[in-house]
Regions:
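N-terminal extension/subdomain marker
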Residues: 34, 39-180
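Structural recognition of the beta-strand scaffold that forms the well-ordered cores
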Residues: 85-90, 120-125, 184-188, 230-234, ...
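Solvent-exposed loop/turn segments at secondary-structure junctions
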Residues: 92-96, 127-131, 190-196, 203-207, ...
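Bacterial N-terminal signal peptides that target proteins for export
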Residues: 3-13
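Bacterial N-terminal signal peptides
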Residues: 14-21
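Active-site-proximal C-terminal subdomain of hydrolase catalytic domains
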Residues: 227-283
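A short, glycine/acidic-enriched catalytic loop
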Residues: 152, 192-224
């Protein structure tokens, strides 16, 4: 009887999982292939992730970047901290290596007309086996800052596992420490697998961030700074759920996410035009 019950439960679990898998995760990818990757990565241990701990990415003031950010090299940084810092955690994955979608969204951010005197748009780019544009290397993770001439690299590190919570918390701490502002927000860009599988597919380290790891990363950065993000946005599929919201609630006032799939090219970043110099901050 027990064996029969267990068999029924396994069958039910498979039937429940199939519709999720078939929906895919970003239309321009192969649905079964993407979720096979996510399921595989979710089942692996973090032996590769542990090898990257403490190296490369900025973590705390006691462990500074080996190449301090040359922030005063850019005139556009003179007014840092007046309004807000938006941090974009850009896990390129096959969305970039196969389709160039991450590069496309960086183009959209550049042409949105952001008032860079009052808004810091900071990107941490990695997790792709190849970059179609931008001259980025799969052997590195790169910090990009939006300036009046477009994105410029302000810091680079040896390739970090973007499915490691230490990498995400390191990037957030980097933003807090070097780009102080009145408010902060975070965009998480890549594949999403919902509350069961988590977010992000780093195709170099074959790893992703589970909800527990997202919570760990936020606690070690947002929580440690005793601040709260204005919003966290998932430019990723399937991340709008009560389970995800409950994890983010202590760390952000708002969550922006989709309960369904998204197109491969993700959000239309023209919405950043609301941060143009024609818009009065606070209105």
């Amino acid at each position: 009887m027990k064996k029969r019950t267990r068999k029924k439960l396994r069958t039910l679990w498979c039937l429940l999982l199939v519709p999720v898998v078939l929906t895919g995760c970003r239309i321009r990818t192969t649905p079964m292939g993407v979720f096979a990757q996510i399921l595989e990565y979710a089942g692996q241990n973090n032996s590769q992730a542990s090898s990257s701990h403490g190296h490369g990415t900025y973590h705390t003031e006691s462990q500074p970047s080996s190449t301090p950010i040359p922030q005063m090299d850019y005139d556009s940084l003179d007014a840092i901290g007046e309004v807000q810092t938006i941090m974009v955690y850009l896990v390129g994955s096959d969305l970039e290596s196969d389709y160039g979608n991450a590069s496309l969204d960086l183009d959209e951010m550049e042409t949105a007309g952001v008032d860079i005197a009052h808004n810091n748009i900071l990107v941490y780019a990695g997790g792709a086996s190849e970059w179609q544009d931008r001259g980025l290397s799969s052997d590195e993770c790169t910090v990009l800052l939006l300036t009046d001439t477009g994105f410029v690299p302000v810091d680079t590190y040896p390739a970090e596992n973007m499915g490691d919570p230490l990498t995400l918390s390191g990037f957030l701490n980097y933003g807090f420490d070097f780009f102080p502002a009145d408010s902060y927000s975070l965009i998480l860009w890549d594949h999403g697998g919902g509350p069961v599988l988590g977010y992000g597919v780093d195709e170099n380290f074959r790893d992703l961030l589970t909800l527990d790891e997202l919570s760990e990363a936020l606690e070690d950065s947002v929580g440690a700074h005793m601040t709260k993000l204005e919003w966290i946005g998932f430019d990723a599929c399937l991340m709008s759920s009560l389970e995800v919201a409950s994890v983010l609630a202590p760390y952000a006032n708002y969550m922006i996410a989709s309960q369904e799939t998204e197109p491969g090219w993700g959000w239309n970043y023209d919405f950043l035009s609301e941060l143009s110099d024609e818009v009065i901050p606070g209105d």
